[in-house]
Amino acid sequence: MFFPDLIIKAYAKYINKKNKLWINNPLDAQQKTFELLIKNGRKTVYGKKYRFEKIQTYNDFKSSVPIIEYEDIKPFISLIRKGEKNILWPGSPIYLCKTSGTTSGTKFI
């Protein structure tokens, strides 16, 4: 067997095993993903504003983080457009897209 084939086969086996874990345990996978997102979000301006460090459960999240509209995060987007980091998510976005703004004008997402 050709060496790259061995690597690809081993990697495919690894991915298959990982996929089976979340397929067979979807609630555990969702909980781990939730915890990772909250952990990473703690480092951001948005996460600090909504006290992500206190969030342990989905109910904590629901009671701490409001449902928002674009206008609510517009100040955060402005900071990102100025080049600031760790605003809505750790680091900086690769790029911002300009929407057509069908209901209320142009927006950056």
Predicted regions and their residues:
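Nucleotide 5′-phosphate-binding alpha/beta core
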Residues: 1-98, 104-109
